[in-house]
């Protein structure tokens, strides 16, 4: 199986399966000399880990990260950093009924057709369990970006099923299990999820991710544009069915006089471009939206086929998230960080000495909405 590595200079290769002994990532290309301990990584893993509320999977995994290499006396050495997370709460017997059948909406059928073998236990390699090492690697990337440029990467849920979650304040996000930036709507979201769980069904979500204090100039046109690589990384996240940068699909309805963000000496008037023009960062906030589909594993019986092609009915008994989008925010943050750090190193390699006389304008003109 190929396709397990993200990045060009700062690379992340993940390994493991949902019900194997461990999962992990090898981070290569991290610059030497950065302070790094497990504690720098654990915070983001704790935000993503299962079993943190009644609204997510009840699989109890501590997700304690171990740094096996690439760090000496508390500093990165420039050699590959191996991050290991041991699986401790597998319940493979829950999947005995799908050994010979394919779950609708899952990778069961496609993995079988492509490889001729599949690990049916919790989805194996295709499980969202494999996002844990992505988050661990992303924490390393976040730390480097923060120390080099003051870059801050944050995310929140803006929609749960049919319920819009209006943005109020960033301070609300860590205070609820939905990563909602609006505390007032949390009771409604909890009632909604309780009803969904009783019905044995699932729902999708929309996630917003914002990177602030991003340097100007990141991105490699034409085919390694920054927005193209962001979309590529985000589409590698389980259950993502759509990615928008900036105004996204709303751009279709806008006139050019509205969409084109005007430049002034005091800053940009608007950010419909989402912080990227011509595939290169402008220094404005990079804004990304993700559409996440409903969880395919539900208790409701579904029609399918078995390996022989015969009709079959599939019921899923494992422990699953009624909405995988609830835990997706820290994963999306990690992916954005990984793309940005890779492009920061690529920019430094080719254009680090480039100087122009034109001053860099502020990301936002005074009086413009944030």
Swiss-Prot record:
Q: Which GO terms describe its molecular function?
A: chorismate synthase activity; FMN binding
Gene3D superfamilies according to UniProt? Chorismate synthase AroC
* A Pfam entry, by short name: Chorismate_synt
Q: What class of enzyme is it?
A: lyase
Q: Which reaction does it catalyse?
A: 5-O-(1-carboxyvinyl)-3-phosphoshikimate = chorismate + phosphate
Per UniProt, FMN binds at 125-127, 238-239, 278, 293-297, 319
Q: Tell me which cofactor or cofactors this protein depends on.
A: FMNH2
**Top-rank taxon:** Bacteria
- Please give the GO cellular component terms listed in this UniProt entry: cytosol
* Cofactor-binding details, from the entry: Reduced FMN (FMNH(2)).
Pathway where it operates: Metabolic intermediate biosynthesis; chorismate biosynthesis; chorismate from D-erythrose 4-phosphate and phosphoenolpyruvate: step 7/7
Identify the EC number(s). Answer: 4.2.3.5
According to the record, the residues making up region (Disordered) are 41-60
Where on this chain does NADP(+) bind? Answer: 48, 54
Please name the GO terms of the biological process aspect recorded for this protein, alphabetically.
amino acid biosynthetic process; aromatic amino acid family biosynthetic process; chorismate biosynthetic process
Which family, according to the similarity comment?
Belongs to the chorismate synthase family.
User: What quaternary arrangement does the UniProt entry report?
Assistant: Homotetramer.
Q: What does this protein do?
A: This reaction introduces a second double bond into the aromatic ring system.
NCBIfam families according to UniProt: aroC, PRK05382.1
What name does the UniProt record give this protein?
A: Chorismate synthase
Annotated source species = Cupriavidus pinatubonensis (strain JMP 134 / LMG 1197)
